[in-house]
């Protein structure tokens, strides 16, 4: 923990060094995207619009990877005020509060339309919980896209995952992997490529675009496009910093991040088909941001879809609710009345 705070202080000092003395209010923005990512242009465009809005703001960008920060620490970083705006993978950050993972539990919302409805239903209580627990406000919620299986050995159905080591990044994903007879391995995204290369993991779960831009097809051979979630991300702002902004500045930030959210949802609905095409060597395959490979694509069996749905309903939801209720006694009721309602699911 001491190492975390030392690293955080050094990173914050680095971010602050570029501020200078001018009339604009700096927005210390910590991002998880890099130039290779399909989501990078949309976030950069939002930052440029904030700076050009005339509201007296200047977006100063830093990256988790460049600074050596852990994405799972995002909530602590925004709560501490080390950064004003922080983006994070919600499932990773939920180690600090299981309630947050409820927005995208494995097997609940496995296509973009269902996921959008779930996010819209959960947004208000998600934002409220973020405010109560972490002193932050939610400005954008968006997905990377369908989370599917990439393996470095033949895989045709979920049965082929038995005994394999599968990279996971959320608690509910690990529960699904265990139920399939595989072993979940928690590995940060930057370390997945060498882990697959060296046999630390046999498979990994991520979106097609993240896998392609992360060069996973160089170390995997088979792709099972069975979506188990949407990998929800969020842009959060420190509430104390937000309160110091004037109404024009708050309006500019809200407007531009809402537009970014819309752009990233639209991207998630389209970019992953191109990424899949590129990974299996099929046209059309846009030259950027993806690279063409020759992976083998498996067909998704209806029985596997039903299997994921059943594991989610009978195991994942109840296990998550048990964890969540320890920290938030109204957790189950809140979920049933929001996402459960729109997805026609009830946690008993």
What are these regions (language model features)?
Residues 110-133:
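Short, solvent-exposed loop/beta-turn-alpha elements that line the ligand-binding surface or hinge
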Residues 8-17:
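Bacterial N-terminal signal peptides
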Residues 24-112, 132-348:
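N-terminal secretory/targeting leader peptides
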Residues 1-9:
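Bacterial N-terminal signal peptides that target proteins for export
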Residues 19-23:
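Sec/Tat signal peptide C-region and signal peptidase I cleavage site
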């Amino acid at each position: 923990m001491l190492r975390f705070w030392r690293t955080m202080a050094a990173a914050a000092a680095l971010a602050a060094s570029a501020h200078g003395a001018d009339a604009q209010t700096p927005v210390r923005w910590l991002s998880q995207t890099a130039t290779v990512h399909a989501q990078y242009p949309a976030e950069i465009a939002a930052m440029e619009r904030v700076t050009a809005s005339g509201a007296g703001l200047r977006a100063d960008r830093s990256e988790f990877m460049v600074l050596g920060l852990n994405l799972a620490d995002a909530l602590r970083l925004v709560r501490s005020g080390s950064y004003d705006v922080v983006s994070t993978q919600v499932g990773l950050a939920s180690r600090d509060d299981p309630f947050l993972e409820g927005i995208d539990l494995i097997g609940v919302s496995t296509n973009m339309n269902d996921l959008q409805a779930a996010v819209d239903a959960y947004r208000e209580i998600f934002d409220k919980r973020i405010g109560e627990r972490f002193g932050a406000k939610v400005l954008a919620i968006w997905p990377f896209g369908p989370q599917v299986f990439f393996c470095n050995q033949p895989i045709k159905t979920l049965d082929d995952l038995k005994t394999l080591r599968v990279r996971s990044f959320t608690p509910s994903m690990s529960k699904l992997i265990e139920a399939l007879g595989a072993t979940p391995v928690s590995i940060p995204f930057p370390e997945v490529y060498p882990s697959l290369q060296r046999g630390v993991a046999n498979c990994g779960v991520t979106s097609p675009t993240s896998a392609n831009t992360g060069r996973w097809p160089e170390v995997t051979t088979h792709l099972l496009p069975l979506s188990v979630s949407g990998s929800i991300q969020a842009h959060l702002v420190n509430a104390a910093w937000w309160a110091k902004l004037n109404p024009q500045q708050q309006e500019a930030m809200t407007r531009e991040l809402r537009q970014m959210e819309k752009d990233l949802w639209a991207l998630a609905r389209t970019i992953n088909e191109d990424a899949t095409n590129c990974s299996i060597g099929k046209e059309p395959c846009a030259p950027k941001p993806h690279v063409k490979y020759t992976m083998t694509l498996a067909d998704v069996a209806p029985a596997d879809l039903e299997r994921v749905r059943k594991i989610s309903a009978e195991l994942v939801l109840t296990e998550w609710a048990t964890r969540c209720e320890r920290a938030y006694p109204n957790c189950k009721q809140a979920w049933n009345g929001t996402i459960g309602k729109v997805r026609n699911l009830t946690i008993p």
